[in-house]
């Protein structure tokens, strides 16, 4: 049997109301690990309900093994010698915030606000009081809660503007009956500007090689509200090995300007108001607790403050593909990210507008698009007004076998088409324009999951599954090129070069100078990789990949490409081995992929249908793990 005895009325009530969470139960095997786990659980429960000085050692156990041989009669009791400060709940008092700049200037300024006092260098507070109120999850008069302490530290560090930060709690005075903790926050601002320069190299299966360069400049706390303004400039240049003509050279240039705010700026959502409503519930419960000696409702301590960001970005991209086309993309995006708990992230792109335009084509490219209308539609000049939502869930950091799951839902053009419908135009009518350009209309959904089975510190099996579909309708018959799916490459089916598989059983004899990629509306893919440590920081891998893409609408120019039961059996399969050099912050990866089964007709029967073994080899250089 298990009995909880000797606790005061408040603690006893808390333990009784959390009976279903107890880790010690009658009939289970007796173990010291279970006792330690229960001590930790009780500590968390008490510290979330005001007992700031409570520690695991203040819970003791008395075991009687004589009364019933083979069984243990267990009593859980508070330690008799625990200090007086650990025997009562503590309440939050005043919050003192000391802000230092990166130069450690003298503190000369002071600002008093209800519940808060700020000390800072100069005459103007470097970080507005509203940011501190949203980040510090304590309120004067409420009971101390460990979750609020943890959330405060996470919020402040999450702002990304401090080089050092500390949160401490101290009794207001030294009297015996003191039950008030003042909060002392000390923070040092980091340097306001950050700059980064990244260099990369590319070698593609079509023998294109070249360097890439990216430069980003960021200003933190730009408007004294922990905002970040960032400007990024990037470019790359590629040339064809063995070719002497400059017409075979390609390049890409792009730039992005973004404004990031450390809160959710939504007209219909006010996290501050939510916090006020929550605080009012706390205040009412506090009054009852003090007058009637009742504990606070436990659900109040399940509250998770909304921690989110708002980002507004403007971008432009210029792509020149030698001998084929020049493609320009400009756009803007309003993005929200927030966490409902540390393992669940939500991302909402409430407004995303892209304009795609092919400003130059060659006769060779025009002849290809005339023979392939679907390619022409996917790359024509068009506006893409879209809304998307992404949900990501991860396993706890303590899980032995970690997992990662992500779902995406995206739609484009439906709001615009709905406005047209209000003027009498059919929702499914084609030929509608926005800003004198046709707009794309589609819906897209994807699901992806990763799971790693850890056998030992040196051996694990990583697995990945992906499924996606994009369907164009209404004003479009083909989804934009950038929204379609592809298979092959360093992070896909590694036995085949990037974008060379599918759709379905279709296969084109493209040359090494071709930029016509194989894409589809539906994608299924699965990967498995056995990872082992060879020696030092060098790891090895043995992998198996499978997948393909298909078209929803039949395309006469690409036979065997449609989504049918027969074509679903057309799956590309590849295997191979790889090396990974782990530099902690950077993983350099080399994979040698071997194609086992091509989904198209190669003229050879059987599962292994690659004509020549040399043709099945693909070498990939990459940064980071494939999944």
Q: Predicted segment positions?
A:
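C-terminal beta-signal and terminal closure region of outer-membrane beta-barrel proteins
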Residues: 487-495, 556-627
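C-terminal outer-membrane beta-barrel translocator/porin domains of Gram-negative envelope proteins
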Residues: 114, 118, 202-206, 347-533, ...
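Interaction-mediating elements
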Residues: 1-158, 167, 180
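Strand-connecting loop/turn motifs
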Residues: 51, 192, 224-226, 309, ...
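Gram-negative/organellar outer-membrane beta-barrel architecture
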Residues: 11-14, 25-28, 125-126, 145-404, ...
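Solvent-exposed coil/turn segments that connect beta secondary-structure elements
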Residues: 3-9, 59, 77-83, 95, ...
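Membrane-embedded beta-strand positions of outer-membrane beta-barrel proteins
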Residues: 197-199, 229-233, 312-314, 405-409, ...
């Amino acid at each position: 049997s298990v009995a909880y005895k000797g606790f005061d009325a408040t603690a006893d009530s808390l333990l009784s109301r959390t009976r279903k969470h107890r880790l010690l139960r009658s009939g289970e095997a007796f173990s010291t690990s279970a006792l330690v786990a229960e001590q930790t659980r009780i500590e968390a429960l008490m510290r979330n309900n005001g007992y700031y000085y409570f520690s695991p050692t203040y819970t003791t156990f008395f075991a009687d093994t004589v009364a019933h041989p083979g069984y243990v009669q267990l009593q859980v009791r508070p330690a008799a010698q625990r200090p007086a400060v650990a025997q009562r709940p503590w309440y939050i008092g005043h919050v003192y915030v000391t802000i230092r700049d990166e130069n450690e200037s003298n503190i000369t300024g002071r600002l008093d606000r209800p519940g808060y006092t700020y000390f800072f260098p100069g005459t103007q507070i470097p970080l507005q009081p509203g940011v501190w109120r949203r980040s510090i999850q304590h309120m004067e008069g409420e009971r101390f809660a460990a979750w609020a302490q943890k959330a405060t530290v996470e919020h402040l560090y999450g702002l990304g503007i401090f080089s050092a930060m500390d949160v401490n709690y101290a009794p207001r005075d030294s009297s015996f009956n003191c039950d008030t903790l003042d909060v002392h926050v000390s923070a040092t601002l980091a340097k306001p500007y950050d700059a980064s320069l990244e260099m990369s190299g590319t070698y593609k299966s079509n023998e294109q090689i070249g360097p890439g360069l990216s430069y980003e400049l960021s200003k933190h706390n730009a408007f004294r509200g922990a905002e970040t303004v960032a400007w990024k400039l990037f470019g790359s240049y590629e040339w064809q090995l063995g070719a002497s003509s400059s017409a075979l050279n390609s390049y890409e240039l792009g730039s992005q300007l973004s404004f990031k705010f450390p809160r959710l700026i939504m007209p219909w959502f006010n996290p501050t108001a939510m916090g006020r409503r929550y605080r009012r519930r706390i205040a009412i419960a506090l009054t009852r607790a003090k007058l009637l000696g009742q504990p606070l409702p436990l659900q109040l301590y399940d509250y998770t403050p909304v921690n989110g960001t708002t980002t507004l970005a403007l971008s432009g991209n210029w792509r020149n593909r030698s001998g084929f086309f020049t493609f320009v993309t400009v756009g803007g995006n309003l993005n929200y990210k927030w966490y409902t708990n540390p393992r669940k992230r939500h991302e909402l792109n409430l407004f995303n507008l892209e304009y795609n335009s092919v400003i130059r084509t060659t006769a060779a490219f025009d002849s290809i698009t005339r023979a392939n209308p679907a390619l022409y539609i996917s790359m024509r000049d068009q506006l893409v007004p879209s809304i998307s939502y992404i949900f990501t869930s991860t396993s706890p950091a303590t899980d032995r076998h970690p997992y990662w799951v992500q779902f995406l839902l995206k739609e484009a053009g439906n709001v615009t088409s709905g406005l047209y419908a209000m003027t009498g135009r059919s929702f499914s009518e084609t030929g509608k324009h926005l800003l004198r350009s046709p707009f794309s209309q589609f819906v897209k959904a994807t699901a992806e999951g990763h799971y790693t089975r850890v056998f030992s510190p040196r051996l694990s099996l990583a697995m990945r599954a992906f499924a996606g579909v994009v369907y164009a309708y209404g004003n479009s018959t083909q989804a934009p090129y950038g929204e379609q799916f592809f298979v092959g490459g360093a992070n896909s089916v590694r036995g085949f070069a990037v974008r060379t598989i599918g759709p379905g059983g279709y296969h084109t004899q493209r040359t090494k100078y071709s930029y016509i990629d194989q894409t589809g509306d539906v994608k299924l893919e699965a990967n498995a990789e056995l990872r082992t440590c060879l020696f030092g920081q060098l790891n090895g891998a043995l992998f198996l990949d499978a997948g393909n893409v298909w078209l929803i609408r039949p395309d006469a120019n690409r036979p065997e490409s449609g989504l049918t039961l027969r074509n679903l059996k057309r799956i590309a399969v590849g295997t191979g081995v790889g090396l990974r050099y782990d530099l902690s912050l950077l993983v350099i990866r080399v994979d040698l992929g071997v194609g086992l089964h091509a989904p198209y007709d190669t003229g050879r029967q059987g599962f292994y249908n690659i004509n020549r073994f040399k043709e099945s080899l693909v070498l990939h250089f990459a940064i980071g793990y494939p999944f």
